[in-house]
Amino acid sequence: MLKEVVYCGVCTYPIDYCEFSGKLKRCKVWLKENHADLYDKLYSEDDAAAASLSAKLAESSIGEAREEKLEKDLQKLQTKQENKEQRELAKKLSSKVIVKREARTKRKYIVAISGLEVFEIDMKKLAKTFASKFATGCSVSKNAEKKEEVVVQGDVLDEVVAYIHSLLEEKGMKDVKVETIDTKKKKKPEATPAAK
């Protein structure tokens, strides 16, 4: 018998696992607003237990001071977590993806894609996707800055840029800059015959 699984709108875990996400308070608020019946089923005992525990703590004067301190610590921890998430999002939005086309020998090219490690994209899977999508050789290697980059053999610059745009849109990052660099080998200027 199949059971329908409800996923949390805050942490994207199944609602039974929200406590492991570190965002339990916000998850509870979301669940109460969107699925009140499930909220009552999962957290009604917890709320009753918390109420009785706080009543017991309120009876002792040491418990009140301790509870206030714990609440302040919890509040600080939550604000730190929110600030960290905002910094990570700002870092993702401010970073850019660089797609560089380089000429090899004769009429052969490679396309090197760097800057994707910030977006939590599995580079090996992406390389495999490019290899099958463009029917070319593709690998993951370290560039001069010791960062991973995907190297695609062939002149597929436009297709790669379009695919990366769609990939970032799926992740909700369509504001990220995708910079293309086209480096072509310069031809040697022909020597002009010396004037006699």
UniProtKB/Swiss-Prot annotation:
Primary location class: cytoplasm
Ribonucleoprotein recorded as keyword: yes
Any single Pfam family the record assigns to this protein: SUI1
Annotated ranges, domain SUI1: 97-168
Compartment(s) where it occurs, according to its Swiss-Prot or TrEMBL record: Cytoplasm
Gene Ontology MF, one: mRNA binding
Cellular component terms (Gene Ontology): cytoplasm; ribonucleoprotein complex; ribosome
GO BP term, pick one: formation of translation preinitiation complex
Keywords, sorted A to Z: Cytoplasm, Ribonucleoprotein, Ribosomal protein
Subunit structure: Interacts with the 40S ribosomal subunit.
Domain writeup: The SUI1 domain may be involved in RNA binding.
Protein family per UniProt: Belongs to the DENR family.
Protein name: Translation machinery-associated protein 22
Gene that encodes it: TMA22
